[in-house]
UniProtKB/Swiss-Prot annotation:
Its EC number is 2.7.8.7. Disulfide bonds: none annotated. Keywords: Cytoplasm, Fatty acid biosynthesis, Fatty acid metabolism, Lipid biosynthesis, Lipid metabolism, Magnesium, Metal-binding, Transferase. The gene is acpS. It is found in: Cytoplasm. This is Holo-[acyl-carrier-protein] synthase. GO terms for biological process: fatty acid biosynthetic process. It comes from Streptococcus mutans serotype c (strain ATCC 700610 / UA159). GO terms for molecular function: holo-[acyl-carrier-protein] synthase activity; magnesium ion binding.
Length: 119
């Protein structure tokens, strides 16, 4: 049974400005493993990655019903499966997590659905 659905939209240019203003911005949003991937990327792809992870973590917090605040960005980790699709590898939720991250020229959108395991 679906117990939560969250979506989030991030402006890529706003994320880039935040990253340029603070050298610690990426390390606040990303886990160590995510940060390793982030630093291996270049140019626009780097900012898209950061914006996508931020949007996905915000979407998770909405689906989970907590919002970012009681849940920290570091409590969530999103890596790629063997096909390259994003998956949560760290979260406080024990059920199934479905995630989609989409990019356009100016925005990144993320959608997260939380589903209870069959009882």
């Amino acid at each position: 049974m679906i117990i939560g659905h969250g979506i989030d939209l991030q402006d890529i240019a706003a994320v880039q400005r935040a990253h340029e203003r603070s050298s610690r911005f990426a390390s606040k949003v990303l886990t160590f493993k995510e940060l390793e991937i982030f630093t291996s990327l270049k140019g626009r792809r780097q900012v898209e990655y950061l914006a996508g992870r931020w949007a996905a973590k915000e979407a998770f917090s909405k689906a989970y019903g907590s919002g970012i605040g009681s849940l920290r960005f570091q409590d969530l980790e999103i890596l790629a499966n063997n096909k390259g699709a994003p998956i949560f590898t760290k979260s406080p939720f024990s059920g199934n997590i479905f995630i989609s991250i989409s990019h356009s020229k100016n925005y990144v959108e993320a959608s997260v659905i939380l589903e209870e395991n069959n009882l």
